[in-house]
A protein has these predicted regions:
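A structural signal for isolated positions on well-ordered beta-strands in alpha/beta enzyme cores
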Residues: 22, 48, 68, 94-98, ...
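Short helix-loop-beta connector
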Residues: 60-66, 155-156
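Conserved S-adenosyl-L-methionine
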Residues: 62-64, 86-95
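Reductase modules of NAD(P)H-dependent flavoproteins
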Residues: 103-295
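Histidine-anchored nucleotide/phosphate-binding helix
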Residues: 78-88
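Short, glycine-rich nucleotide/cofactor-binding loops
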Residues: 67-77
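A short, basic/flexible loop-to-alpha-helix module at the beginning of a structural domain
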Residues: 51-63
Length: 295
């Protein structure tokens, strides 16, 4: 892949499995990495990988014994991992998994999840299609209040976990809160910014996403596209950056903004000290002028 940057991958191996990783790569139009992985990678190719990271898991000490999993699209993967782990280890937990997908063709792992729901009495699974094929007789629509009440009428007794596209994520979380579920009983997986950051509320209208600025770091000056994060600009130039979540939370990729203007995407958890001294998270910061940064 040459100078292709590192990319976060959805792992689906149960936590107790050892010795290998399984990954799921969703095809994205004009994707930076997905096209290469899906169309060019061959059996026997080697990759350098960091270890899995993240905290989107069920916690037996703090979470309720009953779980409500709300999944959208390819974000079914963390739930598949947790479902396998809970069921095959014999844990005393009750799971309801509601999976929203456009159609059957893109509903990955549907057959396995259907089989598991028949084998294990403590696991209920329901697929909901928003653009169902003609003749489909299952549930249609979205993961809304009607669906939740129908398949998890005891939702107040459950810890809810949400993972999916940003729109679905916000919709489901707002729905659960309006239904009376407490914030402490909702766990959600954080994702990076929108594929088109220029459509995010707050983006300066005078800046075109394809506009190219200059980014100075040390003795190097590289191109930085307005619609791509500073992190991606650095990675495209072959400059390695410590990075983990790529969602504006962990701060591992933070840099100091010396000169220039940036757009800070929604969801960046910037510490007060970082804000005071000019540090930003490069994964959620987008150039709006020529820039100079320091590591």
């Amino acid at each position: 892949m040459g100078q292709e940057p590192p990319v976060p991958i959805a792992y689906r191996v149960p936590p107790k499995e050892r010795g290998y990783y399984e990954i799921t790569v969703a095809e994205i139009k004009d994707g930076y990495v997905s096209d290469y992985v899906l169309n060019h990678v061959q059996v026997g190719d080697h990759f350098l990988s960091s270890g899995p990271a993240g905290h989107f898991v069920y916690n037996t000490a703090f979470h309720k014994k009953k779980s409500l999993f709300l999944a959208g699209g390819s974000s079914i993967t963390p739930f598949l991992s947790m479902v396998r782990d809970i069921l095959y280890s014999g844990e005393d937990r009750d799971i309801v998994l509601l999976y929203g997908a456009r159609n059957l063709h893109v509903a990955i792992y549907h057959d396995e999840l259907t089989r598991l729901s028949k084998e294990f009495p403590n696991f209920a699974y329901q697929l909901v299609l928003s653009e169902a094929e003609e003749g489909y007789k299952g549930e249609k629509g979205f993961l809304d209040e009607r669906i939740i009440r129908k398949y998890a009428s005891d939702f107040q007794e459950r810890t809810a976990y949400i993972s999916g596209p940003n729109a679905m994520h916000h919709f489901c979380k707002d729905t659960l809160l309006k239904m009376g579920l407490k914030q402490k009983d909702i766990r959600d997986e954080v994702f990076g910014s929108s594929n088109d950051i220029t459509k995010e509320e707050g983006w300066p209208k005078e800046i075109d996403g394809n506009q190219i600025f200059k980014l100075k770091v040390g003795d190097q000056v590289v191109d930085a596209k307005a619609g791509e994060s500073i992190l991606v600009a650095l990675e495209r130039a072959g400059i390695r950056v410590n990075v983990c979540c790529r969602s504006g939370e962990c701060s591992l990729c933070r840099v100091k903004l010396v000169l220039g203007k940036v757009y800070l995407a929604n969801g960046m958890l910037l510490r007060l000290a970082d804000s005071k001294f000019g540090y930003i998270h490069s994964c959620k910061s987008y150039p709006n002028s020529d820039l100079e940064i320091e590591f």
